[in-house]
Amino acid sequence: METPIAEELAKKQKSISVAEFFEKNRQILGFDSAPRSLITTVKEAVDNALDACEEAGILPDILVQVERTGPDYVTVIIEDNGPGIVREQIPKVFAKLLYGSRFHALKQSRGQQGIGISAAVLYAQMTAGRHTKILSKTSPTAPAHYYELMINTSTNEPDILVDEVRDWFRPHGTQIELEMRAAYVKGRRQSIYEYLKATAIVNPHARITLIDPDGNEEVFERATDKMPEPAEEILPHPEGIELGTLMKMLHYTERQKLAPFLRYSFCKIGLLTAEEICKAAGLDPEIDPHALGRHEARKLIEAFEKVKIMAPPTDCLSPIGEDLIYRGLEKETTVDFIATSTRKPAVYSGNPFVVEVGMAYGGNLPKEEKISIMRFANRVPLLYQQGGCVTTHAVEDIKWKQYGLNQPGGGIPVGPVILLIHVASINVPFTSESKDAIADIPVIKEEIDLAIKEVARKLKHYLSKQSNLKKRREKEIIITKVLPKLAAKVAHVLEKDVPDINPVVAKIMGNLLVHRVIKNNGDGTVDVAIKVKNFGTSAYSFRVHEMLPCKVSGAKPEPKVVTMGNDYDYVWDISASAGSSKVLSYKIESASEEELQKLPQLIVEGIEEELVTGAKAFKGV
């Protein structure tokens, strides 16, 4: 009797392991080209290093080294000073997909699924046929454990080739070495260098060193010794929970009554709120949750929407903060203006999130190109699929002309700008498993829009101020060309010395006048008065610096003194309201006429140079 076709087909059907699936679909995880495969590998290892260091409270010190081992092959070594990994866990952490500690944790973290670094190990063994080398140490008194591993794709279990103890100079940390088919590229936005530079900006507490295949070393120094606030794990929030998820929670709970189940399974539900939800759902608070079916679960979800429940807590998030975004941009860019904004936390589908934006303008940034958008999710740079990301869509939808930037044909504006956008959440809604772009969630897009507009308004104010200062500068240039000639002619007619025109220029311009008046007492001593007069309509707070090669006496008011080699910097902190005058005085015990003529120009710190007459000026930070 002939075997039915259905039975023949059934013999061919079998399950596959997750490792086999990703072995044949590696592009899903970001291993679709030689350059990108290397970036993805470095990204996964650096993410793990940063997460481990932060959880242990250690300031990260990370080394990334890339070596060419053939025309199409590289070896990449990533080393960190983190807490290390205990011996028993090393094979599973690096050679078993979907193995990790963060998948069920509701808090902000870089990695979550437990796929990333194992996928890199899988890619290395597929393309180079090589095992991965791992060295890890947990304390100065413990030995370092060395493994050589591969992944058994049939079982998704680690194959251990070498397991031994070694000496290692580090007190604690982890090193991973992989050889793979990949390409190291330079001069592109999508490169190892740009990825690490972007990582350094949003992780200013980290020190990252890159050694490229040519042996060149680039160090991204940390800008702060302050660790980020640790993110706390929270319970799920009832807003946006799906029916199947709730049914699973009801089935597996250890609680025997519905009200306690609600209270201890969700955040922001207390005893009174739990009873109110039960009442709204028409369910007995004493009923056993295990007895509830699909119909009752749907009633609970409807009750969640009816009852007012507080928003989820936000201590599960760890935003960078405006000050550290500023420092990160300042450290890695050369610009004239930086503005930052951190929004208040918001919620989508029960998931807390926060949006942060930084904007850098001017300096050596290209003026005729589209602005550079730096996208981040949970402090991780997003280098690919910019056009499919909600951050880009938010940028394109803003009318940039009203903020001082050209936007020919709409879309991304043109100008010397870096726009940094960071979305932090316990569950960032990526568009794919490769985590390249954030999905178009309306509330997230709205928060991005508001944060961008906040820094854009600051840019508009800065550009307006710069335009006014430029006009003042042009006016002052004309005045300082005409007045000296006029003063010289009048002095010649009257047969007098040419007067100092600075007070006249300051009065015409409405500037702050700062000038030095010297009186030689004839006994070898000199009285010096620094006269300050505010001819403007605004109050100013600033510092006056007097750099001298000698010590002074009798200074009033008493200045702060900074020794700089053989010179002394005398510093006065001054506040001058509109129309007010100040006098700073001191005495020099002995000085010749020649020395007095060589006194350096006074310096005013804290005011633009266009607003000061008679002294050098700089705005400062």
Curated annotation (Swiss-Prot):
It is an enzyme of class 5 (isomerase). InterPro entries: HATPase_C_sf (IPR036890), Ribosomal_Su5_D2-typ_SF (IPR020568), Ribosomal_uS13-like_H2TH (IPR010979), Ribsml_uS5_D2-typ_fold_subgr (IPR014721), Top6b_C (IPR040494), TopoVI_B (IPR005734), TopoVI_B_transducer (IPR015320). Pfam families: HATPase_c (PF02518), Top6b_C (PF18000), Topo-VIb_trans (PF09239). ATP binds at residues 48, 80, 101-102, 111-118, 435. The keyword Plastid does not apply. Keywords: ATP-binding, DNA-binding, Isomerase, Nucleotide-binding, Topoisomerase. The keyword Heme does not apply. One of its GO terms (biological process) is DNA topological change. Its EC number is 5.6.2.2. It catalyses: ATP-dependent breakage, passage and rejoining of double-stranded DNA. One of its GO terms (molecular function) is DNA topoisomerase type II (double strand cut, ATP-hydrolyzing) activity. Belongs to the TOP6B family. NCBIfam families: PRK04184.1, top6b. Relaxes both positive and negative superturns and exhibits a strong decatenase activity. Homodimer. Heterotetramer of two Top6A and two Top6B chains. This is Type 2 DNA topoisomerase 6 subunit B.
